Amino acid sequence: QLLAQTLDCIAAPDTLVVIDPVMADNGSYYKFTTSQCVVRVYKNPIRFAMYDKNNRAVIYEEAEPLAFGLKTTQTMRRSGDEDFYGCGMQQGNFSYAGKEADIEVTGWDEDQSSNPAPFYMSTKGYGVFRNTFAPGHYAFNGTEMLDKNYDDGFKLMGFTSQLTHNENRFDAFYFYGPSLKDLLNDYTDITGKPFMPAMWMLTMGDADCYNKGEQRTGWPQSTPDVISQVADKYVEYDMPRGWILPNDGYGCGYVKLDSVVTELGKRGFHTGLWTENGVDKIAYEVGKCGTRLCKLDVAWVGEGYEFALNGCKSAFEGIESNTNERGFVWAVCGWAGTQRYSTVWSGDQVSNWDYIRYHIPTITGAGLSAMNAATSDVDGIFGGSPKTYTRDLQWKVFTPIFMTMSGWADADRQPWVYGHPYTDINRKFLKLKMRLNPYAYTYCHEAHMTGVPMARAMVLEFPDDVVTRDTTTQYQFMSGEWMMVAPVYTRKNVRDSIYFPAGEWYDYWTGKKYEGGKWLDKYEAKLDICPVFIRQGAIIPMYPDMNYVGEKPADVLTLDLYPYGNTSFNLYEDDGLTRDYKKGEFARTLISVSSPKGEKGTITVDIAKAKGDYKGRYQERTYLLDVRSESSPSNVTVAEKPLSAISPEAFNAGQEGWYFDASDRMGRVKVRTNRLSTNQDQKIVIGF
């Protein structure tokens, strides 16, 4: 770091570990040695470089001295096989080798910037955060330098990157990973970890306006109308739900807020407000009426990234100052540090098939700047159609946070609006998202601790696979560690160009097996199918079917298992609502599965006793195992006691036991236990 001033985008400058490097004069440069790398400071002209700990392999090197003036530019050498990620939310982009990125808001269309961040990282193992609120421009496509040969025989071809901000100062943090996940952790050590969402925030949000006179409905609206016109219909159509903004729109106020919040809560909704005039009423809105979400707008946040970040902070802290529950902010303009408080959203857009296509790398690219809660409106706010709505919704259920916004297009954006078959398909995917809450919640906690997002560009999970590094796989992503999603973004019910990294992969819907290192074309995906593939060894925890968080107890835990070798999943749970987890009130449950690799043999499932505690933790649980297997087992034991083979009917009626279904996704073993203590280790063995 060079002469850093503490800006609001820095979260905790006093908590950084101070490193005491060993300095030496090496003639043409000063050498600063740490346990992981060496920093060279060349004397004439002054330039910086980073090498490995042996001072032989170059990691980065400035090609020329910093250029100061009205703008400050850093020029870096780059290798021909080097790729770059970060730069915040850039519409339609996540990988920048040979490209340019605006580090300022330029718009909401493809190839524009909606939520920039002055940060990037490289496949060479380093990252840079420019500590500034000044707009900038990063060009990873310069070619004017001569090639350079290094001591270790490495040749750095004459490519450069020019990194510019509109100010006459230079203040930067450099990170050495070497992995991309390490770099995200380092970056968020400085700018702050992504906020930990309450579990209800992982359900679909619904935004509309019920105090706007020009609304196109043709009938007078008042805030309480949201209850009968929207909330009750979610109940009528058996639709999962979680949060709602009844005053989403310019000019919206609200009436009878306290009773509206109460009635919406009875129907499974948390209530938020579009906040246009600041947060001066937030004590009343949150503390007395019970709202839990603020949507911000430039109308009061003001122009500039510092104002926007301070607005997020004020709203977030305003919520948390008036309740023990967690803050939630919907931001218009993000920057480095926004991830501490807010979801970042890609803007007001017209939906079509291209909208779906380019939002895949938009969201995964934002994740590569630690924006775990990056999202966009389902089917945009303008345009759209029944099919684009359904296709857009079905892939977004595999991301942490998403919402709809009604009142701008001819058709509203509730999931039942287009009727059959779309209503049924939308319900299917929303119910799946609810069931996947323990999986998503665990990965959101990982994001909160490390900066690594849940919706991951393929390169983040498979960094050694060169196919994943550039835009080749930009239209697919990993949801957590185990689920790969390849959305359909054309009118045809076919998805081409699906890439499988090394290992075995299984179709989530049919169980068909695919070998890694290969491509798949012409995957048939009818409208009710989003291509999803499960990685070998997967452990996917699921809660019971429910329409909102807390509707039913979650004391039955399903484990969707794809045994292959030794794998594990460290389930994270807390009360799902309050900030008591910050006091240590949470529990981890390590779930481990061991089996032969790709062969028939004994499958052992170990469920460790819960480590930690919190109010409401289940002391006992029933476990349902849904295990991929191409053949029927000969026996199943729970805690070394034999489990009886039973009929599917008895199983579904709640009886303890197991059965094998050869017709279910190429073979599944179903196991149901009685209620077992979560304070003791549990072992389930499936023998063949």
Region roles according to the model:
Residues 2-13, 40-54, 62-63, 195, ...:
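Extended Gly/Ser/Thr-rich low-complexity repeat segments
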Residues 221-249:
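Catalytic domains of carbohydrate-active enzymes, especially glycoside hydrolases
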